[in-house]
Amino acid sequence: METGLPFAFKQETRKLMGEQLWKVLSDNIDEPPVTSVRLNMPKCGNLRIVTTVAHSPVAWCRNSYYVEKRPNFTLDPLMHAGAYYVQEASSMFVEYCLDYALETLRKDGLESPSLVLDLCAAPGGKSLILRDTLPASCLLFSNEPIRQRANILAENIIKHGNPDVVVTNNYA
């Protein structure tokens, strides 16, 4: 299958991955991307949105679904109202990791964090997951060093409706 990737890249990747994994990659790289969404439960608790947008659940992230056919999200007022967030399923894995970390802290007799920093937060998917997963008493700072991206981050955080997130635009 022709992937449009540079020949040298394909050769090196094939060598690193081995023939079996390379075949899986090359067979799937030209497939249309899979779309997924994360529901904002306080805004769509009745789950009616699941039947209109979502298809099958993302295994590692609560309230997340694959979309069978990608709609025109920019025309959907529910998306603009923050009822759901369009997000790549692999980036939702942060919820699974955070759940594990919080459970480990609990088992070790340590307190949950009271302050968390998302250092490069735009466009906001990770921050939204962090805010939904962290204890209510935890304050989240979502920083984005690039001004234009920080504006998008702020807009997405506002849409989601969490007042306990501070959006900043700072370099380390």
Residue ranges and their predicted role:
Residues 1-172:
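S-adenosylmethionine
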